[in-house]
């Protein structure tokens, strides 16, 4: 059973675990990179964030806000 429904009612289905910790098939990986540039001027610190989420039961459906698909790309 696919957890993603497409069309006007696109949502991530029963397996939607948006903004919740769950054990099982869903995982979220976050990476933060800090760059310090030193030179003639004052020190500048730059932060870059990258976040990746995968839900195995959602057929490539990525949960957005309010458990909606972002984008709705069900197959």
From Swiss-Prot:
Read off the Pfam families from this record.
Metallothio_2
Do you know which InterPro entries this protein is assigned to?
A: Metalthion_15p
Q: Which UniProt keywords apply?
A: Metal-binding, Metal-thiolate cluster
**Molecular function per GO:** metal ion binding
Q: Which family does it belong to?
A: Belongs to the metallothionein superfamily. Type 15 family.
PANTHER family per UniProt: METALLOTHIONEIN-LIKE PROTEIN, METALLOTHIONEIN-LIKE PROTEIN 2A
What is the protein name stated in its UniProt record? Metallothionein-like protein 1
């Amino acid at each position: 059973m696919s957890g993603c429904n497409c069309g006007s009612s696109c949502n991530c289905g029963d397996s939607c675990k948006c903004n919740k910790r769950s054990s099982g098939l869903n995982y979220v990986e976050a990476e933060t990179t800090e760059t310090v540039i030193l030179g003639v001027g004052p020190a500048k610190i730059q932060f870059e964030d990258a976040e990746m989420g995968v839900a195995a039961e959602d057929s490539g459906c990525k949960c957005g806000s309010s458990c909606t698909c972002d984008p709705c790309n069900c197959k």
